[in-house]
Structure formats: C-alpha cells, structure tokens
Amino acid sequence: MVLEDLGKRINGAFANLSKGGDIDEALDAMLKEVCSALLESDVNIKLVSQLRQKVKNSVKATPNGASKKKVIQKALFDELVNLVGVDESAASAAKFKPQKGKSNVVMFVGLQGSGKTTSCTKLAVYYQRRGFKVGLVCADTFRAGAFDQLKQNATKAKIPFFGSYTETDPVAVAAEGVAKFKKEKFEIIIVDTSGRHRQESELFTEMVDIGAAVKPDSTIMVLDASIGQAAEPQSRAFKDASDFGSIILTKMDGHAKGGGAISAVAATNTPIIFIGTGEHIHDLEAFSPKQFISKLLGIGDLQGLMETMQSLNLDQKKTMEHIQEGIFTLADLRDQMGNMLKMGSLSSIAGMIPGLSGMASSISDEEGTRRIKRMIYILDSMNQKELDSDGSIFKEVPSRITRVARGSGTSIREVEEVLQQQKMMASMASRMGGKNGMMSRMQNAQNNPAQMAAAQRRAQQMMGGGAGGMPGMGGMPGMGGMPGMGGMPGMGGGMPDMSALQGMFPGGMPDMGQMMNMVQNNPQMKAMARSMGLGI
C-alpha cells in the first residue's frame, strides 16, 4: 500500500466517524480500519497496538461536555505524528544548519542500492537552489561505475564534483576532494562513500576512517523505504558503528512499505530529515512529522509551502505591484509559470494546499511540467508589447495568435488557452486590487507566523471527511485561476491566513466540493484546469 492509498484509507475512516450513530462503535470501526491500513503498510504490529490503546485512553479521559469526535480526531492525528517522529531533543540535536561563508562537510553512508549516490546529488541541488556553493566528492572506490554515476548526475545538475579513476583508497580520495573544495571556499561539501550488499565489517571500518579524515559536520545515512520494518535493525547497526545524526529515506513514491520504514526508523529515535519522492533531482522533500501527516491526511502543509517559496527567493515583487493595482499581464503569467517550475513537482505543490491534496493523484508530474513548459514557449514567442498587455491586443489583431503559434511550435488552440488563462487571472486581479480589494485584506494577514500556525491548526480540526470533502473545509478562492495550483499571483509574499480569507466571502468560503462543481460547470475554468494537467 503506497502512502497515497494509506492516506485515503485513514481519511475514509475519518469520514465514517462523521456519519453519526453511536460514537463508541464508530471509534472501534475507525480504529480497526486505521490499524488495518497501517499493518498493510508494514508498520510494526506492536507500534500499531500502542497507537490504538493511546487513542482509546485519550477518548476515555474526555471531560464531560467535550466533543468526543474532535477528541478522537486530535488523538489519532497526534498519535500518527508520534508514530513517525522522534523526541524534540533528538530532532534538534541532529538538525543540520549549514552556515554560509563556512565550509560544511556532509558525509553519506548506507548499503549499496539504497539510492545513496542519487540522494547526494539531490541534496546538493536542494542547497544549491537555496544559494549555497556546493561540491560533490565521490569516495566510493568499491563499486564499478560509482564515479561515472556521480559525474553524470552532477554534470546534469551543474554541480562541481571530484573523484578519481586511478586512486583506490577511499580515504585518500575523500580527504583530497574535501581539501580541494575547502580551498575554493565551497560552503557545502558532500562526500559519497562506498556501500555494500550487506553489513560487512569492512564497510564500517571504512566509514570510520573516512569520517576521521574529513571530519564531517553532519553524517547522514540513506535507507531504502522498500525494506519496511527491516529499517530498524539496519539503522541500529549503522548507528552503533558510525554515529550518524540523521536519515534520508529513499523510494517513498512507489513502495508499499514506506509507512513501515518511517515508523521503524522513528523507533530508533533517529530523525528523518529528508524523504526521496521520485527519480528526478528535485524529488527530495524536507521531512517534518506533523507536516508529513498533514499532507497524508489531505490537510495540506501551508507552512511547508511558505518555506519552499521563501527559501527559493522567488521574484514576485513586480507581480505583487501589478496585483495591487488590479493588473495582471501576460508577462506576469510567464513569471508565475517560471516560478512553478522552480518549486518542484505539481503533485508535491498540490499536497501542500489544504483540500487540493486529494487531487494530487490526478496530476501526472511529467505531463503537467510539459504543459507548463509549452505555455512558457508560447509566452516567450510574444514580443514585449504583447507581454506587457492585458491580452486584448490579440483580439484586435488575430493574426498575432497565428504568428505566436508558429514561433513557439504549438497550436492556435494552445495559444488561445494561454490567453484565456491570462484573461481569467486578470479578472481576478481586478477584483483583488485597490484599497478595498482582496489583496489589501490578504496583506493584513500574511507574513504572520502565528496566524499561519493557527490556520494549520484549524485545518487539522476539519479532518472529519477526508481530502476534498472535509466538512466545512474552506477551499482556496479562485482555484481555477491558480497557474497549475502554484498559488495566487503574488503568493510569494506569504500565504494569507485562512480566517482572513473567510471574511472575504459573505456566505462563507466554498468547500472543495463546491469549488469542483464551479470548475465543472464553467467551461473556461474546466478548459484551463485541463491545460494544467488536472484530471477534471
């Protein structure tokens, strides 16, 4: 059972709890379904049994007059977080915070085939996109082709690398590579070490020797999520031999035992800092237990979305100014499309937005990215006068559409769809702009961490009906106008607090069911959603 299916099963159990009837019977049925789903995901039976008992104990302690349903929902959420998390002191101690202007050495360890070399490149890209000067060192002299693999990955990602085809001593290669990058003032130096097919003593000796030579600021173990519960003894064995501080769990995107692997690692009290969610170099997500469970249950991860946007330093200043004036040009649309590609996969972004998580499975990341790129080709084929316009120039001179289609290698229909999307965004911008517009109200709420935390808590309290149908769960306004669900124009300044958005709708914010009906019943919105790769 992949994690997506696990989330659906748990959400289905929540939905049954909301149907009414005897609450105690509903609790037993819900726990039976949740525990069954966890066991199928290879979570240890002892851990599942403990979760069931802790939830029941929390419900028994419910004070008179309190809502049992809310207590059950909160208790299960908290216990799921505890299942995949470690205590705060261990997480804080292992948290790697690289400093700019200083050389930070990171050493990777793990068994062969765990995805270690690929994860090295992913982490390098992760920090490179955040402004760090990153270098890769291949100290894996055991596996044939290891240096070629790292070289290929690093070249594709445009990351400087170091390795040797002739030197067979991994300690010498590691020391030389780290010394070279330190001399050249690299800020993050990632050392890839050798792996083995099993836990051999030579591997552990080699890890200790390399660690002594390069003196890493952080040692990360890479584990394959497909091994499920076996992650616990494997991580304990490595922990005893090399005192690594944290773990990257790979292959979380398509294996049935991902949940079991996470809970098994958590049982060792070793924090997971990243999870690999795909084969591409950008498919690496920072791991937070609360945010992970929130996304799993379809609640979204507003905090994670904000952190992603802020860490990438997306340039939204010009678009923000236009929105405040009630304007949205074709150039603004091009900027938004570019920012979408920088943020990562569409399904990952969808998973961070409350209520849209359930739609993530209908998005093919490859197809969505392809369509966004084609939209950018179309916009890049326009001249500056056209880009600075509101699109009406194409209506006045229709031959421009044909010229742009030919120049971009696309069809007239695709150009018209881009113009239609810009028109819808411009219409939204006109409603949002001005002193009394939505943007003005949003700015009063954004950039406020306390309000953001409160918004996430409110989302958690609305878990009753599962993703896409949580009772009373507010959807994001104007979903049809969000470029590929990347967010409202100007969202780079921070997501607005949900309570602030509530006040902008006199009748209350529409839930996701209502919003989907709006899309289905509006041909323009439906066409635009399809153009973005949504299965609508």
Swiss-Prot record:
Predominant localisation class: cytoplasm
Protein location: Cytoplasm; Endoplasmic reticulum
EC number: 3.6.5.4
Positions of region (G-domain): 1-297
Keywords recorded for this protein, A-Z: Cytoplasm, Endoplasmic reticulum, GTP-binding, Hydrolase, Nucleotide-binding, Ribonucleoprotein, RNA-binding, Signal recognition particle
Region (M-domain): 298-536
Signal sequence coordinates: none
A Gene Ontology molecular function term of the record: GTPase activity
Reactions listed under catalytic activity: GTP + H2O = GDP + phosphate + H(+)
Pfam families in alphabetical order: SRP54, SRP54_N, SRP_SPB
Keyword Cell division annotated: no
A GO CC annotation given for this chain: cytosol
A Gene Ontology biological process term: SRP-dependent cotranslational protein targeting to membrane, translocation
Record: residues binding GTP: 110-117, 192-196, 250-253
InterPro entries: AAA+_ATPase, P-loop_NTPase, Signal_recog_part_SRP54_M_sf, Signal_recog_particl_SRP54_hlx, Signal_recog_particle_SRP54_M, SRP/SRP_N, SRP54, SRP54_euk
Subunit relationships: Fungal signal recognition particle consists of a 7S RNA molecule (SCR1) and at least seven protein subunits: SRP72, SRP68, SRP54, SEC65, SRP21, SRP14 and SRP7.
Role: Signal-recognition-particle (SRP) assembly has a crucial role in targeting secretory proteins to the rough endoplasmic reticulum (ER) membrane. SRP is required for the cotranslational protein translocation for ER import and preferentially recognizes strongly hydrophobic signal sequences. It is involved in targeting the nascent chain-ribosome (RNC) complex to the ER and is proposed to participate in the arrest of nascent chain elongation during membrane targeting. SRP54 binds to the signal sequence of presecretory protein when they emerge from the ribosomes.
UniProt-listed HAMAP family: SRP54
Assigned protein family: Belongs to the GTP-binding SRP family. SRP54 subfamily.
Entry-linked PANTHER family: SIGNAL RECOGNITION PARTICLE 54K PROTEIN SRP54, SIGNAL RECOGNITION PARTICLE SUBUNIT SRP54
Record-given protein name: Signal recognition particle subunit SRP54
Source taxonomy: Eukaryota, Fungi, Dikarya, Ascomycota, Saccharomycotina
Gene name linked to the record: SRP54
